[in-house]
Amino acid sequence: MTTIILLAPLLGALIGGFGWRLITEKGALVVTTGLLFLSCILSWVVFLTLPAETQHIHLLDWIRSGALDTSWGIRLDRLTAIMLIVVTTVSALVHLYSWGYMAHDENWTHHEAYKARFFAYLSFFTFAMLMLVTSDNLVQMFFGWEGVGVASYLLIGFYYKKPSANAAAIKAFVVNRVGDFGFALGIMGLFFLTDSIDMDVIFASAPELAKTELHFLAWEFNAANLLAVLLFIGAMGKSAQLFLHTWLPDAMEGPTPVSALIHAATMVTAGVFLVCRMSPLFEYAPEAKMMVVYVGAVTAFFAATVGLVQNDIKRVIAYSTCSQLGYMFVAAGSGVYSVAMFHLLTHAFFKAMLFLGAGSVIHAMHHEQDMRNYGGLRKKIPFTFAIMMIGTLAITGVGIPFFSIGGVPVGFAGYLSKDAIIESAFASGNGFAFYVLVAAAGMTSFYSWRLIFLTFYGEARGDHHKHDHAHESPAVMLAPLALLAVGSVLAGMVWYHSFFGDKVASFFNLPAAAHGEAHGTEHATEGHVPEAAMTAEAAHEAAMAGTMAMAEPAAEHAVAKAPQGAIFMAETNHVIHDAHGVPDWVKLSPFGAMVTGFFFAWLYYIGDKPLPGRTARALPGLYRFLLNKWYFDELFDLLFVNPAKSLGRKLWKGGDGAVIDGAINGLALGWIPFFTRVAGRIQSGYLFHYAFAMVLGIVALMFWVVRTGGMN
């Protein structure tokens, strides 16, 4: 069954890409979409019937060279099953949605065949992503990692006639190569120290790696920390974390369904999946985990600030994605890998829905993407408005504080997963991450409601012809939105106990003794007061200190074999347990931030509409700083792009032009004609000239014989 899940999208890609002329373009759409829905249904069957123990499915032998013995296999555990349903569900719905969205694309003429190629690219991406998440060794994972990079390049640059789309595709490809270089170095380092790229061998070797020093770039590093950092650099590139994030907003040049599939729900979460998959290594690398926390927290804050002032509806959601990925990395770095996966799952539902909902708005407004030209659309496209409202309630974290049913808090999906991350950040003792994430939650609420108010409320702005002809999307586009809306509302409550409650150990097949059974409700933690929650004052001081609860290595708890379970939590890791005992003000803080963000968004865009303009004029430097995305693109142009172009130009003009071409052209146009002219003068045609030359030759030959001793 798992093999069918993996290979069905590949079959669809091959048929759609190469066989569409035989089965027609519509036939290719039917085949690719049908195979994706088959893969999706089987993925849910696997997820709901998954046995406790990890399964290893051998497909074929792959690479055998010296100590490297690599097979192609499938690692099936709870982590894999979660990613299977995320990837295949979103991909299947995006395929269905694209039937309507790509039906009449203005970037192509009526006679151009583009749909089969687009659907083939989508299916190929899905196969590469499935190869990544099912891999049983790091080389296979790297091939899937690079496969999604290639598919992303093809899909971002799908409108290859647009220079901006080509530039965005190249930018995404190049920036990701920086992160991939770190990932490759991490794989090589692990193979160098363990003689294996098999995950179970690496996991079993993690305690020894924590005791090993590795010489790298003229310095000595702890091997576990160094290798975990290198792997995380790869995750930073793929998941668009700070410094390697610049490709993600530009990737919105691709078709909107691509944004929903790749840049919201699947490819960008590969980095989070990598950190969670390698949790047995990260648990022995406290400095690397601290780096993950700080990078994630700063990214969440940075992207939220930029999202405050963006005007392109897709770019607002893109920066929202970047920010939410930061939340996931904070959870993973804090050691609560199940919570990171919880937010990954819920985020996939509401972010894919927001992107597809934005696509419905763009479709209604005849491909207008500037929110300043929207307004009053809730009456024109009521179903899309309802969908976008649900997505906004989910991403901003709307719920009922301190109210639960059966131990499950009541709220939209983002309320449960995002609040779990913020509470875990506080419980880990990292005050910096806690306060930064709360601030980011407030800004998330502001820009999300700003999008709603600018798009659906107020008077119509911009081209009145577009407003007059705005219409609801076809049913084939609205049906996927409705299904995603169900997940955006219910996913958090349905799986709360499994990811953050009293079923974590059984759900992820963790030995209870390794970390203590997580207590999923406040009632279950009565009588247990974690150190970080003894008093509100003590908790506040601990948070401000910014010390990590997991800062001490866990090497003393070494195990001789690969740890049991889809994720690994060391015995010293009690963060998920302590998170349920944090003070009430900590639990209320993200809700307060959400309400504050909503209030200011209403004030700026409903209550006092001239206020945004007055604020921008009063703070022009800050406004331009945020509008220009902290000037990261300009900084990278100054430090890397322009020097690289200058060096390339010098090598082209001076190296290729002057040296290589100069040598060849100089030989062809200079020396050869010179010797030709000399030879031409010698060939005079007079007999006595040739006789004189022969005499000179004989004299020279005799002189050489005498000087060298003749025959001796």
Curated annotation (Swiss-Prot):
The chain crosses the membrane at residues 4-24, 28-48, 79-99, 113-133, 138-158, 183-203, 216-236, 256-276, 290-310, 325-345, 346-366, 385-405, 421-441, 475-495, 588-608, 655-675, 686-706. Disruption phenotype: No functional NADH-quinone oxidoreductase complex. Cells lacking this gene have a nearly normal respiratory growth phenotype on lactate, however they are unable to perform anaerobic photosynthesis. It is suggested that in R.capsulatus this complex may function in reverse flow under physiological conditions. GO terms for biological process: ATP synthesis coupled electron transport; electron transport coupled proton transport. One of its GO terms (molecular function) is NADH dehydrogenase (ubiquinone) activity. Pfam families: Proton_antipo_M, Proton_antipo_N. It is an enzyme of class 7 (translocase). One of its GO terms (cellular component) is plasma membrane-derived chromatophore membrane. Keywords: Membrane, NAD, Quinone, Translocase, Transmembrane, Transmembrane helix, Ubiquinone. It is a multi-pass membrane protein. It comes from the Bacteria. It catalyses: a quinone + NADH + 5 H(+)(in) = a quinol + NAD(+) + 4 H(+)(out). NDH-1 shuttles electrons from NADH, via FMN and iron-sulfur (Fe-S) centers, to quinones in the respiratory chain. The immediate electron acceptor for the enzyme in this species is believed to be ubiquinone. Couples the redox reaction to proton translocation (for every two electrons transferred, four hydrogen ions are translocated across the cytoplasmic membrane), and thus conserves the redox energy in a proton gradient. NDH-1 is composed of 14 different subunits. Subunits NuoA, H, J, K, L, M, N constitute the membrane sector of the complex. Belongs to the complex I subunit 5 family. This is NADH-quinone oxidoreductase subunit L. It comes from Rhodobacter capsulatus (Rhodopseudomonas capsulata). The gene is nuoL.
